[in-house]
């Protein structure tokens, strides 16, 4: 099987929705532990209850070395450093009353959000 076909099969199986929201941000070092605790135990579970949200995958960037164009190059850690990928049915999920309520629930808005910066939100349609 050609590599491109293999990649398509992996992609088609890995993402189960037609849209993904990518939310990225930095967090102050003193709030990083609280950020991770609240994101994992409150924020993600709250958003997974929103109709049209199917999964959330969290990640933290790291520096790396990689070979390209005949040389090994340094890849710095990304900025922002934290990213979450939300698989959603359609863009209207993001403006629904359920989404609006979920993002303001728990400790996230009052105890965590003030410690975040460099926030980026990107919406992609899966092809």
Task: Give, region by region, the residue ranges found by the protein language model.
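Macromolecular interaction modules
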Residues: 2-127
């Amino acid at each position: 099987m050609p590599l491109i076909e293999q990649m398509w099969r992996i992609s088609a199986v890995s993402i189960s929705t037609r849209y993904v929201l990518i939310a990225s941000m930095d967090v102050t070092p003193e709030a990083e532990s609280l950020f991770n605790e609240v994101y994992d135990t409150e924020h993600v579970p709250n958003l997974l209850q929103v109709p049209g949200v199917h999964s959330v995958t969290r990640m933290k960037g790291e520096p790396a070395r990689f070979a390209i164009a005949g040389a090994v190059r340094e890849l710095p850690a990304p900025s922002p450093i934290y990213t979450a990928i939300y698989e959603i049915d359609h863009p209207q999920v993001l403006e629904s009353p359920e989404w609006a309520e979920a993002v303001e629930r728990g400790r996230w808005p009052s105890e965590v959000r003030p410690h975040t910066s460099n926030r980026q939100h990107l919406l992609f349609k899966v092809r």
